Amino acid sequence: MTALTLDDMIQLQHLATVGKLVNGLIHNLSGPLQNIGMDVELLEMTLPNEQRGREELVEGIIQRLKRIGEEVDQMAHFIKNTSMRTGTRDETQDLLGVNHLLEQELVFLESNLYFKHQVQTDLKTKGELPRVCDLPRGAAQALGWFIQAIAEAMEMAGTKRLSLEVKMLPPTLHIIFSSDGSPFASSFTAQLNLDRDIADILAADGLNAGEKVTLAALKTCGGSLLFEEAPSGSRTTLTLPIVTP
């Protein structure tokens, strides 16, 4: 049997992520769809027997229709963002600034599109940041996976808040993940090191398959990781090269 190459593993990880998004999308759509159905049924039952004055009746209908419109807008937003991830390379996304990419990832997390969790996030950016296309090929995808991995590890540790700080230190981009409270599992933090061969990363104990592929993908992009832990929390710095001449 032919062994999977790293490119094969990255493609499988991408498909798994799309699967997570579709599953999360279905979960997030069920609530708005149910609300719309209830509002429509309520209107159907109320209108034939409505005894209120015309103005009051019209106002009530308008408010229900506004709520239906908000639910539809929310569904359209989820569908649009999910569809952007169905391809491995999106030229439109390449033109996004890194800050917009990170904002989108955090929206996905907060909407429980990847998985259900209690982790709260905030993002701070300093100065002008590069576009996605200014990073090595595949870096944006690997960055999204790494954010998921950090959030999942925090959820398991019971940590409630994740702060991201992004800044340029040419010729590199620094993304700093800070968390308060409970420490990560040592089996996870011990592997936050890219100063080794890809084969060693893929063979490491203490990580699941997705985490291994994520770290290997970051390694191929020229990324580096520094993990620091203190009594008040932890700090992980991901450094990525900027490839624009």
Language-model features: locations:
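Detector for a conserved hydrophobic position within an alpha-helical segment of the HATPase_c
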Residues: 214-219
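Conserved catalytic submotifs in the C-terminal HATPase_c
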Residues: 118-130, 169
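Glycine-rich/acidic phosphate-handling loop/turn and adjacent ATP-lid/helix
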Residues: 172-210
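Short beta-strand/loop element within the Bergerat-fold HATPase_c
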Residues: 159-179
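Conserved DHp (HisKA) dimerization/phosphotransfer helix of two-component histidine kinases, i.e.
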Residues: 44, 55-115
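Histidine phosphotransfer helical core of two-component systems
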Residues: 3-10, 29-73
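Conserved glycine-rich
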Residues: 222-223
